[in-house]
C-alpha cells in the first residue's frame, strides 16, 4: 500500500513538472514563458524549462527586440547630396519601433540635418522645436538620434539673449552624455573621423528617465546615441542660433 502511494506521488510530481515545462498554466494554453513576460521565463518556469522558453517565439521576441541600425550613408547620400527624405524615413522607422506617433505637427515642423559634414549615419540628428519663445525665454525640443549618431560638440554663448542653459531626459534608448567639465572618463566610444577632435572627455551613460543638466554655462557638450538609437527631451532657455558654437568650424545648423 505504502509502495503504491509513493509510486503515485512520484508520478504526480512528474506530471506536474511536465505540465509546467510544456507551458500549461492557469492562463490556459499560454506557455509559462508568454505568461511570465519579458525576461522572466526561467524564473517563472524553473531551470528545467529554460530550453522551452528559449524556443518559444514570443519569449525570444520579447528578450531580443531592440532597435538597431538599418540605414547607412549609402542610403542617405546620392551623388554626394544629402537625401533628407531618406533621413526622415529612417527616423519614422525608429518612431514606429518605439511606438512614437508621427503627428501632423511633426510632419510640418520636424527637421533632419547632417550639419553640413556629409556623414549623417554618424554625425547628425532629427528634431522638433516645440516652442522657442524669446519674449518669455523658454524652449522645448525633441532630439532624435539614430543608432550610433552623435550631435556635433558645441556650446551656447551669450548674445543679446542669455547663454542657453538646458536639461535633458531620455525617453527611448540611451545616450552617452558628454561634457568638457570633469575628469576624462575611460572607455569612451569612438568619435567619428568626420567630426574631428573634441574637448568634452567626461561622459555618463544616460538611460530612460534620467535627467541631466548642462554643467556650466557656455561649456562644450554633446550626446551620442547608443546602438538602439535615442529619443530625448530637452528643456532650456531661449535658443538663439547666433550663440551656437561648434568645435568643428565646418559644422552648422
Language model regions located:
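Glycine- and acidic-residue-biased ligand/ion/polar-headgroup-sensing regions
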Residues: 146-147, 163-185
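Short beta-strand His + acidic residue motifs that chelate non-heme Fe in jelly-roll/DSBH
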Residues: 152-154, 160, 177-178, 213-214, ...
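Bacterial N-terminal signal peptides that target proteins for export
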Residues: 1-10
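A short, N-terminal "cap"/entry segment at the start of jelly-roll beta-barrel domains
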Residues: 64-139, 193-194
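Double-stranded beta-helix
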Residues: 182-199, 220-253
Amino acid at each position: 500500500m505504502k509502495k503504491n502511494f509513493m509510486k503515485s506521488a512520484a508520478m504526480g510530481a512528474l506530471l506536474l513538472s511536465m505540465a509546467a515545462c510544456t507551458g500549461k498554466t492557469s492562463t490556459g494554453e499560454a506557455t509559462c514563458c508568454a505568461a511570465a513576460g519579458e525576461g522572466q521565463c526561467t524564473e517563472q518556469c524553473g531551470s528545467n524549462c529554460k530550453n522551452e522558453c528559449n524556443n518559444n517565439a514570443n519569449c525570444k521576441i520579447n528578450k531580443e527586440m531592440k532597435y538597431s541600425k538599418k540605414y547607412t550613408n549609402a542610403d542617405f547620400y546620392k551623388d554626394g547630396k544629402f537625401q533628407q527624405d531618406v533621413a526622415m524615413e529612417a527616423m519614422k522607422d525608429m518612431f514606429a519601433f518605439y511606438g512614437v506617433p508621427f503627428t501632423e505637427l511633426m510632419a510640418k515642423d520636424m527637421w533632419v540635418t547632417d550639419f553640413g559634414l556629409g556623414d549623417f549615419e554618424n554625425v547628425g540628428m532629427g528634431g522638433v522645436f516645440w516652442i522657442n519663445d524669446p519674449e518669455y525665454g523658454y524652449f522645448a525640443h525633441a532630439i532624435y538620434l539614430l543608432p550610433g549618431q552623435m550631435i556635433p560638440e558645441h556650446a551656447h554663448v551669450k548674445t543679446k539673449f542669455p547663454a542657453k542653459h538646458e536639461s535633458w531626459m531620455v525617453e527611448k534608448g540611451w545616450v552617452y552624455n558628454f561634457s568638457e567639465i570633469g575628469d576624462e572618463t575611460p572607455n569612451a566610444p569612438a568619435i567619428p573621423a568626420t567630426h574631428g577632435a573634441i574637448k568634452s572627455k567626461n561622459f555618463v551613460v544616460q538611460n530612460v528617465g534620467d535627467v541631466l543638466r548642462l554643467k556650466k554655462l557656455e561649456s562644450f557638450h554633446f550626446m551620442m546615441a547608443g546602438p538602439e538609437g535615442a529619443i530625448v527631451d530637452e528643456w532650456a532657455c531661449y535658443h538663439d542660433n547666433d550663440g551656437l558654437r561648434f568645435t568643428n568650424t565646418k559644422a552648422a545648423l
